[in-house]
Amino acid sequence: MTRREWLALIATAPLLKAAAYEPPTAPVAIAKCASYDEDVAAKLGAMFDQLGGIEKLVRNKTVTIKINMTGAPDLRVQGLALGLTHYTHPKMVGATAYLLGRAGAKRIRFVESAWGTGGPLEDVMLNSGWNVRMLQSAAPGVEFENTNALGKGKRYSTFKVPGSPYMYPAYVLNHAYEETDVFVSLAKLKNHATCGVTLAMKNCFGMTPASIYGDDAGVDEPNEKPTQGRGAVCHEGKRQPSKAAPPELRPNTNHEAEYRIPHVVADLAVARPIHLAIIDGVESIAGGEGPWIGGV
């Protein structure tokens, strides 16, 4: 090899290295929708078409959709309907079910870790003013699961974090996140007091069950009747999760929520990858993720 050839090779090495580690890209579609009075299903269906269709992704498969129902139903912003502010809107939920069913999905399971309860998700939806029967009739095989506890399953599922985990080596979640072929994050576009913004990845922070990661989680066993949030465990690191889950890797590193929550989100994104992200930004709020944040 001549000196000139060697210099040319060295000059291109950084480019080759950068290309080797370039993250994968995915198609994105966006549409303007002035209000939920418009045909939300038509708008969403057109965006699916722009992505190349969803039939290959969902046909004859179980699809699990994580929605955003942050906070108790009785906490409202200026008395407005929850879907107009900080919840995923039920029309978006129904439109998603309809389109997945039309694309051939075998089972459509909507999940959320409902605040302060391990009871049926349908009850929380009814208390939120949602028409559960209408959602059930949007497509064949529609189900609901509250993933804040064990729910309808017989065991929890362990999701190991590949590579170098930030916070926990693995996360123990409701069975619904494992017993699925396709995982969808149906998020609400809004600010977040700690993370800045809530989108598809931050929505999945709510996968962690309060029965294990909650303030009133059992020490040795999960508390299947949780009534509190995850502040002490996930936000502040004041205690470890229930022994049903592995403890934090570096418990004395940082107890600031601004550090901890984004790193938990990053862990979960690789432990339970998202196949399809849908973000509901038709109507929302600014200043925080819900009415409990001052200034919202």
Across the structure, where does each feature detected by a protein language model lie?
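N-terminal export signals
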Residues: R4-Y21
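Extended, low-polarity segments enriched in aliphatic/aromatic residues
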Residues: Y21-V296
